[in-house]
């Protein structure tokens, strides 16, 4: 190959990663989004292989431990009491029911068990049951994650003392677009909860939702916010909007799936050591697009038939896709029929 030919196949001269002292400016993130698709994928795969096994994917299962009746008005959410989605509010599950679900998740190959409650914030009366759930799930040999809304300092510490591994609290979108989706909780409220989680010594799981009508620059704004958290999240879930009937975002035009893949790739480049997770809306991606996401640097996914109140690809389909791609679960034998 001649020198000119070699130069022609090299990606454009945009930094693969920001130096430790440099913040990811929105303009820099936009520049990544605007790379030719093949160049962006090449870059993301380079970064991914520097830090992870390129053919291993971590499996998580998500259980709604308290469904519906949430006080918040998040425009995408079927669990908001502000929206008429036909979802009936339920009480907090009892501990034994949660542990039974965790056992089933482990038997199906999950290595992390995530518990979600539709609350603005947990009440003190809920904390004993929540901490018991954490301890019980950890005793089963699973990593634990919870998403319960905003936390006070003492609540974060109680969860940490129980051994909680991760706390999920998404930023959802960029600061500029946020007000078009949510009015009952501020962006700063979310950042404050993340600070409390960090201060308690719990790993942070924080990502967002794309396809809510935001622009590419606003998607870049979300990634910039996440990448500039100090430190950036250990776990970054990327959700593809599920436009649920009865919510304000019902009827939102679907996002171009290549834009979703680009978002995964940009997240990988800007947060090289984070676990990047395919989350809600994965069923809207065909097998080829999911394979593209793994190539772009996604190395975790929610595994199971339901995510809170939205469906998820069936486990058998996931097993078949992994086999076709030569991907294995990061937990040994996690996809075997007898796992």
From Swiss-Prot:
Key word Iron-sulfur present: yes
UniProt-listed Pfam families: BATS, Radical_SAM
Known catalytic reactions: (4R,5S)-dethiobiotin + (sulfur carrier)-SH + 2 reduced [2Fe-2S]-[ferredoxin] + 2 S-adenosyl-L-methionine = (sulfur carrier)-H + biotin + 2 5'-deoxyadenosine + 2 L-methionine + 2 oxidized [2Fe-2S]-[ferredoxin]
Enzyme Commission number: 2.8.1.6
Cofactor annotation comment: Binds 1 [4Fe-4S] cluster. The cluster is coordinated with 3 cysteines and an exchangeable S-adenosyl-L-methionine.
Alphabetized SUPFAM superfamilies for the sequence: Radical SAM enzymes
Classification via InterPro entries: Aldolase_TIM, BATS_dom, Biotin_synth/BioAB, Biotin_synthase, Elp3/MiaA/NifB-like_rSAM, rSAM
Subunit relationships: Homodimer.
Family from the record: Belongs to the radical SAM superfamily. Biotin synthase family.
Protein name: Biotin synthase
Organism: Burkholderia cenocepacia (strain HI2424)
């Amino acid at each position: 190959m001649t020198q000119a030919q070699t130069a022609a196949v090299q990606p454009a001269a945009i930094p693969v990663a920001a130096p430790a002292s440099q913040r990811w400016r929105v303009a820099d993130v936009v520049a990544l989004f605007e790379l030719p698709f093949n160049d962006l994928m090449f870059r993301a795969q380079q970064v991914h292989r520097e830090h992870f096994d390129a053919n291993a994917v971590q499996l998580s299962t998500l259980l709604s431990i308290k469904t519906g009746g949430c006080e918040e008005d998040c425009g995408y959410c079927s669990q908001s009491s502000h929206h008429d989605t036909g979802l009936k509010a339920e009480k907090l599950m009892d501990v034994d029911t949660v542990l039974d679900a965790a056992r089933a998740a482990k038997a199906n190959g999950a290595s992390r068990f995530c518990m979600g409650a539709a609350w603005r914030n947990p009440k003190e009366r809920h904390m004993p049951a929540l901490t018991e759930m954490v301890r019980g799930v950890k005793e089963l040999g699973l990593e634990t994650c919870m998403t319960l809304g905003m936390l006070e300092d003492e609540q974060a510490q109680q969860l940490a003392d129980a051994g909680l591994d991760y706390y999920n609290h998404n930023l959802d979108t960029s600061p500029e677009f946020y007000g078009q989706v949510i009015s009952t909780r501020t962006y700063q409220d979310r950042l404050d909860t993340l600070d409390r989680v960090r201060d308690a010594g719990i790993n942070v799981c924080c990502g967002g939702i794309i396809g809510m009508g935001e622009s590419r620059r606003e998607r870049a704004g979300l990634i910039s916010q996440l990448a500039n958290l100090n430190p950036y999240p250990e776990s970054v879930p990327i959700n593809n909007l599920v436009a649920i009937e009865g919510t304000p975002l019902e009827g939102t035009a679907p996002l171009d799936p290549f834009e979703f893949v680009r978002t995964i790739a940009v997240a990988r480049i800007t947060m090289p050591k984070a676990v990047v997770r395919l989350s809600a809306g994965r069923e809207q991606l065909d097998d080829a697009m999911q394979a593209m996401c793994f190539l772009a640097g996604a190395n975790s996914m929610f595994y199971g038939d339901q995510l809170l109140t939205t469906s998820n690809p069936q486990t058998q389909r996931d097993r078949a896709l992994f086999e076709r791609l030569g991907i294995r679960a990061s937990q040994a034998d996690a996809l075997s029929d007898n796992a």
